[in-house]
């Protein structure tokens, strides 16, 4: 059959072969867009269809020029077109944003997260198109090598002028930093990936200069200097610090449209949270990318772009909370029963100052829900290990990152479902029952921890809201969110980021703190310990009494019950201009500190 197909295509005229290629791309493109529209509800805008189709045709032409054989070119083009379009649609349904260049860096972590048929499918989506590409290229033709050199030189040349190139593309194809889904739909997937790849090149290749850092510090210093923590009494013992980051921990009772048969949260937690003023931490992420929540809670600077900071933003040794506490005599221990290298945690934890990192290999996996170790087992084993360490005379910074609570929220036979709903959403039903057990295991642990370490400082919070279905599906019936980030109200943007926060200040008990952006936690912890820390940890102090939650291309600002969402292309001159200059300065200093030359560490100290 292959030989007959070869004979048939070889006997066709050049015009016929090119006509077949163009017709195939048009038909296949239409089919894939139909699947994307009817299954994922994602499709380019009508005005973008011609340019998107033209980009796909250009890709097919390049492929055919390297092959000259339709029987190899057509399957290769089909595989790439399907993978690019459907993976983008799938990611939008899960996270509300399309595929970005940093997602390719994160692919190894995706493979570590998946198992069984899901892992096999993910590998196939990546491997099959590239395997077909290698088979497609006619390596024996001299013309192929000349074209390859030409294409490589062309790509290299564009990368050398990435700044002007992306500026031109922004002018032609538009760009909205806060609405990446809108970018994809107005450009098409191929143009979107090229445009954002060039932007990634510009962003990663240019770090702030000393003059730019000094100008940014001039904006940030007045707010930071006003923050002066009380010193701990001389000779007072150092208190242990326990930071508990709870996977997908959220107040599911807010799902009022789903008919929950009971409150998923343990009544003991509900009372503890009430004593803490029903405080919330404001997270930079939704449904995943826990590493960004970790970065903020440990390093004191916001994540403002749509990438995993541990992988693409944290390149330097940095004065984060673990390092600051280590210099004060603490033993920093991070515990997370996942694959050690997930989200680059081995390198990231080392760079921010943890002395010890316990991952899945350091725990007995004795109480699994699916592949996730229960919180009860994690708490017990971690405290046993801390209690048996050789340097028990040193205070400990105990950073606990739970794994139980990860989508798709499995429970084992020892944890039967206790809650029913009127909602047929399988993920939602699984999640509310998981929260029933997760909150109870937390409270059982807190009772023991507060008994054994009554003076310890305990900080616990959810890392992000749970994923409850494509397009924020689980939240729609309760009118908490809309299915498109671009259409969310100011209150919805707040809801998208807010998870429970409880801070127990030893014998003083829970503290009412209101809304605390996650990146403000390190300075708050040092304040409660009476440790000043380096000046840099105070630079994220916002102007006035504002709570500012940056998100990609926008930020939420709250002040005494008032709230405003400032979007980059839709700035309100009044409330937004007050914080915009501060945020841009903070981004400059953050890039310098964690990825650049660290000029900020050589700057003059804050004026007291």
What does each model-identified segment do?
Residues 101-102, 117, 184-189, 287-288, ...:
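Membrane-interface micro-motifs in multi-pass membrane enzymes
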Residues 161-243:
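Membrane-interface segments at or immediately adjacent to transmembrane helices
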Residues 224-232, 236, 243-246, 251-608:
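Solvent-exposed soluble domains appended to multi-pass membrane proteins
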């Amino acid at each position: 059959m292959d030989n007959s197909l070869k004979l048939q295509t070889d006997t066709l005229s050049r015009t016929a072969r090119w006509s077949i290629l163009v017709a195939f791309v048009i038909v296949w493109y239409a089919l894939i867009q139909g699947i994307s529209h009817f299954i994922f509800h994602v499709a380019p805008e009508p005005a973008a269809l011609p340019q998107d189709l033209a980009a796909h045709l250009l890709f097919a032409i390049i492929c055919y020029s390297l092959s000259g054989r339709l029987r190899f070119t057509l399957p290769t083009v089909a595989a790439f077109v399907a993978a690019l379009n459907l993976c983008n649609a799938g990611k939008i349904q899960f996270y509300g944003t399309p595929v970005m260049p940093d997602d390719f860096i994160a692919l190894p972590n995706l493979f570590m997260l998946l198992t069984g048929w899901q892992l096999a499918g993910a590998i196939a989506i990546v491997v099959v198109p590239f395997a077909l590409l290698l088979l497609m290229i006619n390596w024996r033709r001299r013309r192929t090598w000349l074209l390859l050199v030409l294409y490589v030189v062309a790509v290299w040349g564009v990368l050398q002028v990435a700044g002007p190139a992306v500026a031109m593309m922004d002018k032609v194809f538009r760009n909205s930093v806060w609405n990446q889904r809108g970018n994809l739909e107005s450009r098409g997937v191929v143009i979107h990936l090229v445009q954002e790849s060039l932007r990634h090149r510009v962003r990663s290749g240019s770090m702030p200069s000393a003059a730019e850092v000094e100008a940014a510090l001039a904006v940030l210093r007045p707010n930071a200097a006003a923050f002066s923590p009380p010193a701990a009494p001389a000779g007072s013992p150092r208190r242990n610090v326990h930071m508990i980051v709870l996977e997908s921990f959220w107040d599911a009772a807010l799902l009022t449209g789903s008919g929950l048969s009971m409150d998923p949260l343990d009544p003991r937690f509900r009372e503890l949270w009430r004593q803490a003023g029903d405080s919330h931490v404001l997270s930079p992420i939704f449904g995943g990318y826990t590493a960004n929540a970790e970065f903020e809670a440990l390093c004191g600077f916001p994540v403002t772009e749509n990438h995993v900071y541990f992988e693409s933003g944290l390149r330097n040794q940095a004065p984060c909370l673990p390092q600051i506490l280590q210099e004060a005599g603490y033993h920093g221990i991070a515990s997370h029963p996942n694959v050690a290298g997930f989200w680059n945690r081995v390198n990231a934890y080392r760079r921010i100052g943890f002395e010890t990192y316990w991952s899945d290999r350091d725990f007995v996996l004795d109480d699994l829900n699916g592949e996730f170790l229960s919180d009860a087992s994690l708490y017990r084993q971690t405290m046993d290990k801390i209690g048996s360490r050789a340097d028990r005379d040193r205070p400990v910074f105990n950073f606990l990152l739970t794994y139980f609570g990860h989508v798709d929220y499995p429970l084992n036979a020892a944890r039967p479902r206790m809650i029913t709903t009127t909602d047929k959403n399988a993920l939602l039903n699984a999640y509310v029952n998981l929260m029933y057990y997760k909150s109870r295991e937390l409270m059982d642990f807190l009772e023991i921890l507060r008994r054994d370490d009554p003076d310890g400082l305990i900080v616990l919070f959810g890392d992000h809201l749970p994923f409850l279905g494509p397009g924020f599906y689980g939240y729609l019936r309760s009118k908490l969110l809309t299915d498109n980030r671009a259409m969310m109200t100011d209150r919805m943007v707040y809801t998208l980021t807010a998870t429970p926060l409880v801070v127990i200040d030893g014998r003083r008990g829970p503290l009412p703190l209101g809304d605390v952006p996650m990146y403000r936690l390190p300075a708050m912890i040092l304040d409660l310990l009476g440790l000043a820390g380096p000046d840099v940890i105070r630079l994220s102090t916002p102007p006035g009494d504002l709570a500012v939650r940056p998100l990609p291309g926008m930020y939420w600002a709250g002040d005494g019950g008032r709230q405003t969402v400032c979007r980059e292309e839709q700035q309100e001159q009044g409330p937004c201009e007050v914080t915009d200059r501060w945020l841009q300065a903070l981004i400059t200093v953050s890039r310098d500190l964690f990825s650049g030359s660290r000029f900020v560490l050589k700057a003059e100290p804050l004026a007291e």
